[in-house]
Structure formats: structure tokens, C-alpha cells
Curated annotation (Swiss-Prot):
The chain crosses the membrane at residues 13-34, 49-71, 92-114, 129-151, 164-183, 193-215, 240-262, 282-304, 317-339, 359-381, 388-410, 420-442. InterPro entries: MATE_fam, MATE_MdtK, MdtK-like. It comes from Bacillus cereus (strain ATCC 14579 / DSM 31 / CCUG 7414 / JCM 2152 / NBRC 15305 / NCIMB 9373 / NCTC 2599 / NRRL B-3711). It is found in: Cell membrane. It comes from the Bacteria. The gene is norM. The keyword Transport applies. GO terms for biological process: monoatomic ion transport; response to antibiotic. Multidrug efflux pump. It is a multi-pass membrane protein. This is Probable multidrug resistance protein NorM.
Length: 452
């Protein structure tokens, strides 16, 4: 990142920041995408098992990686305020925290996964695949969380192209292992959905190893000497980190877990409905990578400018991010409307699943505008380190408005499973409105401070 003086310079720098993040997020998502689509071509049962397992795993992983994402605004503001010497201590403490969080998640999962799956009254093969999927994914938690911290450090320096290269190097490993283990090609065992979990776990370890090597050997990362000194764990540093990270993580958790909760509630419907819902939701999540990437770029850009006390510049980056998100939302809405048949065909060859997935995809169109506002706005707020109010707003919008409304519509109206999608759409709309109002308040506060 560097200081800019004109809107066109900011737009260029933001796009150069955003594009590698977008490629990185698409590559990471591609692992889940290939897990889902390739499992679906193995059988509807494998697809449903992976869907249930993913619906339990994703909210946990995204919530905790969200906490660790606090690395990005902290380092960005340190770099913006010329305090480079403080960066290694922050990163190492975050790594310690990531490892501790990994062990806590594994321990809790050991006790709660089986009761959760048993209580869902799933078909036996689906429950078995989901349980095995989660057991294997647990082996990849430590590298995934540690990588999240190191990626936050790399991105905060504005070197998002580096994380793009790392994930592009790792993605083929995931795809090849999926091909070998899901379908049993070239003499490997045919493991179905379980093979997808093994492939993802192996890829997480590869990503971590590549990242550590780059930080140790390549500039500008090597000059920070991140691993030169293993600082003692600092409780005060952890608390300061968590004060920022926990609201970020829980805000992300509230948003992602509502989608997972809906998928789990779908267990009351048929395997066909679960599979169709997962296919449509998976593609909607693919499109979500764009506003998510814009949000990450906004956190870096806004954090850098706030650290340098250039608050008008920070505000302009917010406008750029939201404007780009709305443009992409329009494009994706057109894509969903005209190519729903082709999109559904990516996920399944089963006629019933295909037909129902097309109906769910139409609802996904209405996600686009809300995501285009809410997600980038949260990214900007993180750059300002304003995260507590956003946490409350997402809780209200998604869990107090969206999910209960979806349950009522699905249970007591003829909408059935589609009622959950309507509830999600309304919850996301409220969330977008709440968060946008908060961003305006924060920007006004900083602009007023700057004018004094």
C-alpha cells in the first residue's frame, strides 16, 4: 500500500489489491466447490453427507478464522503509522492463539459432533459420511488457522498477489486428490465424500508449508523476521487481539451459521431436497466470494489510511468497494436468471435434484444486492476497528429476524423448504441496511475529528 492523491489512483490501487484476493478466495472456495460437485457425481448420498458435514464445519471454521482475521487491520494500521518493529510480536502472538483455538475446537468437536448428528435423524449412510468427513477435517484445523494468521500479515502489507500464488499452487493438489480418492481412480480406494475430506486436509497442510517458506525467504516479508524470535505467550496481547477479533469472528459466524442452520433444518425434508439446496447454496456461496474479497481489500485499504490519519481517503475507498460490489451483483443476477439450467447441471445428473436446484437458484438472485452492501461495509468497519456494533446488528438481522421468519414460512405455509430461503433474503436485507447506517456514522465521526 502507498499514499494516493486522486480518485483514479485509489481505484487502480484498490483493484490491484482486490483482484489477487478474489483469485485467492475463489481458489480456496474451489476446494469446497470441487468437494461438493465431485461428491455429488459420486452419489446423492455422498453429496448429502458432505453437505451436512460442511454445514457444521464451515460456521466453526469461518467464525474462528474471522477472529484471526484481526491480524489484517492491526498490521495494516501499524504499517500505516510507521511502526514496523511491532509487527513480529503481533503475528507470533496470533499464531499462538490460532494453535490454542485449534486444540479447543478439536476437543469440543470430539464430544458434540456425534450427538448433533444423532439428533438430526439422518439416513444412516448420510450420517456416517458426515461423521467421517468431520473427523478427517479436524486434522487440518491447525494448519488452516495458522495459515489464516500468516495470510493476514501478508495481505496487510498489500502483497495480496503472494497469497494468490500460494493458493493457485495448492489448488491442483486438492483437485487431483479428490479425483483419486472420491472415485477410486488409479488403484486408490473409492471413498466418496470421505475422500473429499482427506483431499482438503492434505491441501491445508501444503498451503501452510508454502506460506512459511515464502515468509522466511522472500521480501518484503523476510525483513520483518517474523520467526526470528519466538516471543513468550502474552495474555495481554491475546486479550487486545481478541477484543477486535471476537466481534469480527462472531459477526462472520452469525452470517455463515444461519446458512448452515438452514441446511441442518433441511434434514427434515428428503435427501433430494437437501442435495438441491446444497447445490444452489454452494453456487450462491461461490458468487459471495466477490463481495467477501472486496471486503478484505477494504479492510486493508481503510486500515492503512486510518493508521496514517487520512480519513477522507479511507471514506473514498469505502465508496469504491461498495460501488464495485453493486456492479458485480447486477452481473451475477443476470447470470443466475439466464443460466440456471446450466448451473444446476454442474452439480447433479439426478433429474429431481436438478429441477429443485433451479428453483432455489432463482431465490439466490435476491441475495446479491444485500451481499453487495453488507459484506463490503463490514470490511470497511473492520478497517476502522469498529466491530462491536456490527456484531449486534448481524445477530439481530440474521438470527432474530431472518431465521425465525424462515422457519415460520417453511413450517406453516405452502412454501415449505423455499420458506427458509425467503427468510434468509429478508434477514440479509435488514443486515445490509443496519450496517450501511453504521458505516455512515463512523465515517462522519472520523471526518469530524479530522476537521478539528
Amino acid at each position: 500500500m502507498k499514499e494516493t492523491t486522486s480518485f483514479s489512483q485509489k481505484l487502480k490501487q484498490f483493484v490491484l489489491l482486490f483482484f489477487p484476493i478474489f483469485v485467492t478466495q475463489m481458489s480456496l472456495f474451489a476446494m469446497s466447490f470441487f468437494d461438493t460437485t465431485m461428491s455429488g457425481h459420486a452419489s446423492p448420498t455422498d453429496l448429502s453427507g458432505v453437505a451436512i458435514g460442511t454445514s457444521i464445519w464451515i460456521p466453526v471454521s469461518t467464525g474462528l478464522t474471522g477472529i484471526l482475521m484481526a491480524t489484517t487491520p492491526i498490521v495494516a494500521q501499524l504499517v500505516g503509522s510507521k511502526k514496523k518493529e511491532d509487527v513480529p510480536h503481533v503475528v507470533i502472538q496470533a499464531v499462538y492463539l490460532a494453535i490454542c483455538a485449534s486444540f479447543v475446537v478439536i476437543l469440543i468437536g470430539f464430544f458434540v459432533v456425534s450427538p448433533i448428528l444423532n439428533g438430526m435423524r439422518l439416513e444412516e449412510p448420510v450420517e456416517r459420511i458426515a461423521a467421517q468427513f468431520l473427523s478427517i477435517i479436524a486434522i487440518g484445523i491447525i494448519p488452516l488457522f495458522t495459515y489464516t494468521v500468516l495470510r493476514g500479515f501478508i495481505d496487510a502489507l498489500g502483497k495480496t498477489r503472494t497469497t494468490m500464488i500460494i493458493t493457485l499452487l495448492s489448488l491442483p493438489i486438492n483437485v487431483i486428490l479428490n479425483y483419486l480418492l472420491i472415485f477410486g481412480n488409479f488403484g486408490f480406494p473409492k471413498l466418496g465424500g470421505v475422500g473429499a475430506a482427506i483431499a482438503s486436509t492434505a491441501t491445508y497442510w501444503c498451503i501452510l508449508i508454502i506460506t512459511v517458506i515464502i515468509i522466511q525467504t522472500k521480501e518484503p516479508f523476510a525483513s520483518f523476521n517474523i520467526f526470528k524470535q519466538l516471543y513468550r505467550p502474552s495474555l495481554s496481547s491475546w486479550i487486545a487481539f481478541l477484543k477486535l477479533g471476537v466481534p469480527i469472528g462472531f459477526a462472520i459466524f452469525f452470517e455463515t451459521s444461519i446458512f448452515a442452520a438452514v441446511t441442518l433444518m433441511m434434514s427434515n425434508f428428503s435427501t433430494t431436497t437437501i442435495a438441491a439446496h446444497q447445490a444452489a447454496m454452494n453456487f450462491a456461496s461461490l458468487l459471495y466470494m466477490t463481495p467477501l474479497s472486496l471486503a478484505m481489500a477494504m479492510t486493508i485499504a481503510v486500515g492503512f489510511e486510518v493508521g496514517a490519519k487520512r480519513y477522507d481517503n479511507a471514506k473514498q475507498y469505502g465508496l469504491i468497494g461498495i460501488g464495485l460490489a453493486l456492479a458485480f451483483a447486477l452481473l451475477y443476477s443476470i447470470l443466475l436468471y439466464f443460466f440456471d439450467d446450466q448451473i444446476a447441471s454442474i452439480y447433479t445428473t439426478d433429474a429431481k435434484v436438478h429441477h429443485l436446484a433451479k428453483e432455489f437458484l432463482i431465490f439466490a438472485i435476491l441475495f446479491q444486492i444485500s451481499d453487495a452492501i453488507a459484506t463490503p461495509v463490514q470490511g470497511a468497519l473492520r478497517g476502522y476497528k469498529d466491530v462491536n456494533v456490527a456484531l449486534i446488528m448481524t445477530l439481530i438481522a440474521y438470527w432474530i429476524i431472518g431465521l425465525p421468519l424462515g422457519y415460520i414460512l417453511a413450517t406453516y405455509t405452502e412454501w415449505a423448504a423455499k420458506g427458509y430461503w425467503i427468510g434468509l433474503i429478508i434477514g440479509l436485507a435488514f443486515g445490509a441496511a443496519f450496517l450501511l447506517i453504521r458505516l455512515f456514522q463512523v465515517q462522519r465521526k472520523y471526518t469530524t475529528q479530522n476537521s478539528r
